[in-house]
């Protein structure tokens, strides 16, 4: 699987992910880009789960962003509805993390759209490790959002066999 982390702090939102793609117990690729920008660079999105499924969801989510003029929450809710009710989409095995200047959200195939109350997202096979690390760093240090994201991903990469240290990090100022 993978690990995706997003942190909001001090006027910035940062999202990062590792680059490992596994097929069963075999590493197939180590430099996949699981975090990318959508909607003219205004939205950061990352995925955990099946790669082909995630690309389908990225396309559908970007279409919803276009349809709803970049309104993140509305686009996420509409994608979740579509994902839950469309037969072909309902079999997809992936989760999306999306963020912009206004919100950070997790979108699941069960139709859930969750905005974490502390602005911290950690998901995927190493998500629990990354969340614990990021939460401790948020509560006990003055590190930047980027530093916390990188540290949490590296800790997850040290522990989770489905997460590596080849990171993709995207950062956005909340004022943009």
Curated annotation (Swiss-Prot):
Na(+) binds at residues 157, 160, 163. SUPFAM superfamilies: N-terminal nucleophile aminohydrolases (Ntn hydrolases). Keywords: Allosteric enzyme, Cytoplasm, Hydrolase, Metal-binding, Protease, Sodium, Threonine protease. InterPro entries: ATP-dep_Prtase_HsIV_su, Ntn_hydrolases_N, Proteasome_sua/b, Proteasome_suB-type. Disulfide bonds: none annotated. Its EC number is 3.4.25.2. It is an enzyme of class 3 (hydrolase). The keyword Disulfide bond does not apply. PANTHER family: ATP-DEPENDENT PROTEASE SUBUNIT HSLV, METALLOPROTEASE TLDD. Protease subunit of a proteasome-like degradation complex believed to be a general protein degrading machinery. HAMAP family: HslV (MF_00248). Belongs to the peptidase T1B family. HslV subfamily. This is ATP-dependent protease subunit HslV. It comes from Pseudomonas entomophila (strain L48). The gene is hslV.
């Amino acid at each position: 699987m993978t690990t995706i982390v997003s942190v909001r702090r001090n006027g910035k939102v940062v999202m990062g992910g590792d680059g490992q793609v596994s097929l069963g117990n075999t590493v197939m690729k180590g430099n996949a880009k699981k975090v990318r920008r959508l909607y003219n660079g205004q939205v950061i999105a990352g995925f955990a789960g099946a790669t082909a499924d995630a690309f389908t969801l990225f396309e559908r989510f970007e279409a919803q962003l276009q349809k709803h003029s970049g309104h993140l929450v509305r686009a996420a809710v509409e994608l979740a509805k579509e994902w839950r009710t469309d037969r072909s989409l309902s079999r997809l095995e992936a989760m999306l993390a999306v963020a912009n200047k206004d919100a950070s959200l997790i979108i699941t195939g069960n139709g859930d759209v969750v905005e974490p109350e502390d602005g911290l997202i950690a998901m995927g096979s190493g998500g629990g490790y990354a969340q614990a690390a990021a939460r401790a760093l948020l509560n006990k240090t003055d590190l930047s959002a980027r530093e916390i994201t990188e540290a949490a991903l590296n800790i997850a990469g040290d522990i989770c066999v489905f997460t590596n240290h080849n990171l993709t990090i995207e950062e956005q100022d909340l004022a943009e």
